[in-house]
């Protein structure tokens, strides 16, 4: 890509002849020179390519067929999302293509804009110089970017009288819907564990004695000096210890009463019952 000075309103590239090809090929554009970029950086300016004009002039016979597809890409995005606009014109249609930018860029990065063309469904021989294209860029430098840039849709100026708006088409990218990203903060339990330190229960202590939870009571306010509406179990230690003692666990109760002799007795009784049942069934069948 060529460099040029930004003193004029538009940066004009040379009018270049392009060969017919079915593969995407770059169109030459003129961008600010390295010196202009340095000056803008020193001034703290950002840059916006406000307007892109592509002047297309055909060089094909009158009975030539096919369509030229011209795409404008922003290389700051991945390949699947980089396309900003697309124009489709008949290969014989002389026209001017206009695209208006909707974003700012910094002078610190390589110019993000890229224009490419290709020809489809044509009877023109591949490799023939079928057209001439000149690119014009209008840049805007400013101290601070506004919050939003007003959208202006692309347009095509048709210069050939043999064609109308029904013979061309163009498309421009729209704003993608944004989905809210939820904060991956700590869970509710994790938040509580950070806010309240876990209580340690010592020997001969119940959980209620060590708990810091309790209801809002006059005596609680007097003793602690603050309301405790969110702490409903803070004063359980005032209850009788018997009311708080759940007793022995199931494993403790079972281990005190169940022995190996009890297990052997259960097995013996079960075997005898099975044998008696089997013998009675055999006798009844013989009778």
Curated annotation (Swiss-Prot):
Pfam families reported in the protein's UniProt record: Gemini_BL1 (PF00845)
Domain of life the protein comes from: Viruses
GO BP term (any one): transport of virus in host, cell to cell
Record-level Gene Ontology MF annotations: DNA binding
Membrane topology qualifier: Peripheral membrane protein
Subcellular location: Host cell membrane; Host microsome membrane; Host endoplasmic reticulum membrane
Subunit structure, interactors included: Binds to dimeric supercoiled plasmid DNA.
Role noted for this protein: Transports viral genome to neighboring plant cells directly through plasmosdesmata, without any budding. The movement protein allows efficient cell to cell propagation, by bypassing the host cell wall barrier. Begomovirus genome is shuttled out of nucleus by Nuclear shuttle protein (NSP) and the movement protein transports the DNA-NSP complex to cell plasmodesmata and facilitates further movement across the cell wall.
Official protein name in the record: Movement protein BC1
